[in-house]
């Protein structure tokens, strides 16, 4: 079943998928009356309390609005909406399954259910590393605090499935054990040490920043580009040379990193994650000190007049007077028209880039089949790598048509250029092999047809996932309940 949200809403929810609690008590600290006697029920001595319900009484409005993210219940299959992506990610997990993001409430459910994490049969099997939990739960911060980063990252995704069971919540972004938080203040914190190091790399040490920068940094713990490095597949942000798409491309090339080898062209590929922080910095909102919460987590009043930060992340147009109208003088209809135009422009460029990159993948395959050498193919494959990296960077930055449309259009334009370069080179190479006719692309008009064209056994994958959900996950939940009963 397709989600009934508008596509604008889905995009906005995705870009804020980890922003929701970044400023949980921000408005409370500014405008709501704080209670000197107000306390939480956090376990004494526990630095990261992962159980969000423990804050339901002391931070009732924030908790209630956070819990309302469960209203984004229905799932929208992004591969059905754009089957091109199946081929673009051939050989990688995203070709199996890619859904639009839902609210924070579903973070654990969704990562368990996606085909990308496979159907592990024990704590040592499955396709993905532990790092795939890293932005899904405050339990991650708890485990890192208990065991260190090496103790967290080591092994497969299923290794600590019984430890990571609470959805994205309060302790991801707030120091919930602090006196400030207990009294209703925001107590923002960087709960992921690898993210804190990355911010220092770009000269933004958390404690030295303004509240504005800290708000964005807390969100940027998760809504960023990152990759897995070293034998333990630890998370690292590729910011050593800067935070632009060009800077990160150079960084990846210099260290010889690839996420996977493409299943059609054999190109060494990069998979962009969700670089919302980076594109926001480049866009008009970031440059004007408008943060994520200003648009997606506005300050609102409850019935008794208490002002708090609304944690039900969604489309700013749903709360126009509390969001857009705080800065813009245009009517809601006028602004919606502007956003729709920008979104259409980005979508058009996205689809144009996809068409060219897909053609390049199949033409590269034809060249390999015709006997091309690695030396002949290297410059072609690098152009394909760079073209798709740029395409992916633009489209993975959810809501970029709103946050930084000019950035998205520029990047997609360079993706088109690089795909064109790849195709020109491979067509010349094919000619030297005696191939001058157009290379045919199989029918990829639907998700099912595209997966069939790649020879993917979806029945097997789905059966393995179903068995995992039926047998392994209930055991995880039992173990988690037993552990938390001892807190």
Curated annotation (Swiss-Prot):
**Residues that span the membrane, as ranges:** none
Binding residues for heme c 5: 285, 324, 327-328
Q: Name one GO biological process term.
A: nitrate assimilation
Where found? Periplasm
Keyword check for NAD, yes or no: no
Q: How is the cofactor bound, as the UniProt entry phrases it?
A: Binds 1 Ca(2+) ion per monomer.
Q: What is its EC number?
A: 1.7.2.2
Location, primary (coarse class): periplasm
Write down any Gene Ontology CC term. outer membrane-bounded periplasmic space
Tell me which residues bind heme c 3: 104, 219, 222-223
Pathway-wise, it operates in:
Nitrogen metabolism; nitrate reduction (assimilation)
Q: Give the protein's biological function.
A: Catalyzes the reduction of nitrite to ammonia, consuming six electrons in the process.
- Know the name of this protein? Cytochrome c-552
Q: Which gene encodes it?
A: nrfA
């Amino acid at each position: 079943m397709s989600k009934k949200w508008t596509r604008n809403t889905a995009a906005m929810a995705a870009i804020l998928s980890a922003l929701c609690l970044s400023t949980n008590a921000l408005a409370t600290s500014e405008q709501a009356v704080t209670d000197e006697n107000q306390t939480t029920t956090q376990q004494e001595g526990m630095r990261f309390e992962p159980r969000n319900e423990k804050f339901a009484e002391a931070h009732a409005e924030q908790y209630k609005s956070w819990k309302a993210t469960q209203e984004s219940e229905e799932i929208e299959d992004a591969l059905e909406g754009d089957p091109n992506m199946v081929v673009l990610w051939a050989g990688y997990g995203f070709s199996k399954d890619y859904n639009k993001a839902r609210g924070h409430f579903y973070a654990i459910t969704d990562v368990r259910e996606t085909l990308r994490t496979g159907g592990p049969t024990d704590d040592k099997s499955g396709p993905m590393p532990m790092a795939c939990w890293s932005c899904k739960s405050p339990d991650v911060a708890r485990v890192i605090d208990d065991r260190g980063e090496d103790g967290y990252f080591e092994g497969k995704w299923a290794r600590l499935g019984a430890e990571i069971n609470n959805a994205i919540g309060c302790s991801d972004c707030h120091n919930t054990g602090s006196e400030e938080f207990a009294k209703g203040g925001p107590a923002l914190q960087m709960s992921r040490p690898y993210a804190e190091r990355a911010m220092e790399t770009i000269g933004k040490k958390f404690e030295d920043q303004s509240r504005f920068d800290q708000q964005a940094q807390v969100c940027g713990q998760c809504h960023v580009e990152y990759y897995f490095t070293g034998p333990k597949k630890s998370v690292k942000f590729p910011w050593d040379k800067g935070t632009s798409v060009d800077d990160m491309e150079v960084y990846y090339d210099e260290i010889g990193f690839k996420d996977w080898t493409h299943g059609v062209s054999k190109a060494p590929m990069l998979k962009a994650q969700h670089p919302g922080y980076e594109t926001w910095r480049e866009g008009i909102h970031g440059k004007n000190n408008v943060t994520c919460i200003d648009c997606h987590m506005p300050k609102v009043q409850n019935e008794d007049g208490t002002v708090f930060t609304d944690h039900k992340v969604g489309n700013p147009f749903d709360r126009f007077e509390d969001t857009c109208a705080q800065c813009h003088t245009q009517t809601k209809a006028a602004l919606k028209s502007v956003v729709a135009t920008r979104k259409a422009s980005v979508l058009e460029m996205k689809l144009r880039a996809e068409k060219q990159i897909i053609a390049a993948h199949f033409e590269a395959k034809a060249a390999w089949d015709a006997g091309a050498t690695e030396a002949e193919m290297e410059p072609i494959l690098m152009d394909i790598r760079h073209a798709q990296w740029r395409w992916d960077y633009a489209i993975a930055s959810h809501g970029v048509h709103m946050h930084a449309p000019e950035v998205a259009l520029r990047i997609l334009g360079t993706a088109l250029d690089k795909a064109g370069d790849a195709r020109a080179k491979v067509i010349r190479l094919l000619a030297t092999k005696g191939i001058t006719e157009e290379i045919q692309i199989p029918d990829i008009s639907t998700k099912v047809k595209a997966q069939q064209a790649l020879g993917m056994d979806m029945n097997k994958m789905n059966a393995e996932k179903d068995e995992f959900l039926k047998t392994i996950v209930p055991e995880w939940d039992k173990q988690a309940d037993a552990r938390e009963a001892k807190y």
